[in-house]
């Protein structure tokens, strides 16, 4: 009842990625049914775009974030250090990074799942992007660019985590991916219903 009547947009964004990991078949079936019902609800597209855009702006305005990394104390890092004097890019939180890809995917699912219920089936970004493409919501090129950037970022992130490093790379290391993701982000956020 809460998810249908009172939940915030960000809670529905999180539901796009949610999946049951433990429970009886009956319980996991109920969860999947509720998740699908919430995701497939028809929404005010302009309000959705405003909510997602405002959420992302708040994240970017937050100049520092707290991150815990294995074997390291709590440290503060800029979300986008390339805007400071340090030429670094946060592959997760920086503009054109993983969060932007996730927000793009979540926005498209929440915007179109009432028409294409298969968009509510998967909870991982790669298969959701494939579904968005197969339903004509993403072009082949946009889907390809998002998947490639997401896979590149994840691979790079795993390598950094194995070295107990924060998810920061030199700003010039991911410029192609960043440009492609920010271009798609701009298109999605400018779409009005």
Regions found by a protein language model. Name each.
Residues 1-193:
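A nucleotide- and high-energy phosphate-metabolite-utilizing enzyme signature
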């Amino acid at each position: 009842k809460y998810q249908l009547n009172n939940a915030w947009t960000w809670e529905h964004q999180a539901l796009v990625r949610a999946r049951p990991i433990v429970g009886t078949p009956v319980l996991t079936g109920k969860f999947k049914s509720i998740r699908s019902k919430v995701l497939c609800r028809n929404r005010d597209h302009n309000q959705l775009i405003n909510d997602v855009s405002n959420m992302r702006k708040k994240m970017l305005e937050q100049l520092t974030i707290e991150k815990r990394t294995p074997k390291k104390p709590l440290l503060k890092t800029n979300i986008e250090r390339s805007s400071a004097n340090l030429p670094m890019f946060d592959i997760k939180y920086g503009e054109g990074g993983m969060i932007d890809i996730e927000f793009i995917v979540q926005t498209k699912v929440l915007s179109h799942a009432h028409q294409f219920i298969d968009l509510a089936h998967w909870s991982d970004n790669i298969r959701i992007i494939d579904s968005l493409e197969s339903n004509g919501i993403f072009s082949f090129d946009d889907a390809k660019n998002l998947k490639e950037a997401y896979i590149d970022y994840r691979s790079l992130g795993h390598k950094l985590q194995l070295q107990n490093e924060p998810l920061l790379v030199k700003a010039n290391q991911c410029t192609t991916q960043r440009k492609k993701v920010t271009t798609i982000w701009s298109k999605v956020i400018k779409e009005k219903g």
